[in-house]
Amino acid sequence: MAYDFKKEFRELYRPSGKPSVVTVPPMSYVAVRGKGNPNTEGGEYQNALPLLYGVAYTIKMSKKGPREIEGYFDFVVPPLEGFWWQDRTDGEIDYARKDDFNFISCIRLPDFVTREDFDWAVSEAAVKKKLDFSAVELLRVDEGLCVQCMHTGPYDDEPATIDAMRTFAAERGYAPDFSEARLHHEIYLSDPRKCAPEKLKTVIRHPIKLI
């Protein structure tokens, strides 16, 4: 049976609808950086998605080709994730200013993926998909101490969940700890093309520190 990160790291991918404090281990991602409204047809965000999935599935399906990746095990491609921020803010997101978004869109990779394996997968995907993969990067993220919560509903309703997270953290002696390396983080467990807005499930995660 294929290794499923959502099941093996349930605390990180399937939190409850109540805020909780977690310590997130370092993880590797295939990532693309960009700017702008994620809902814009043909925008940077939507153009990033086939690149991410192209690399992730090339690595997963390497078992059927001549490439032998040391330590390989079959895995379920993890869900799409995103790190978001806006310039000249304290790390909080203003959902009314979608055109001002900066993002790192990404998909988690197994730790067996080396730089050499990653570069091979990018080259393979570029040939198969006939797309420009030059924006793709191998990213290592160490989030550490965070507060997180499962948000159910439209993306624009996330501020209510974030308010609950902020209150929960403050009551326990934590403060936000946003920086260039520690950002607003979302994990998308639902496909908005196939799921009603009120049923969308999104993990929201914010970096924190003890006061």
At which residue positions do the language-model features occur?
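A solvent-exposed interaction/effector surface
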Residues: M1-I211
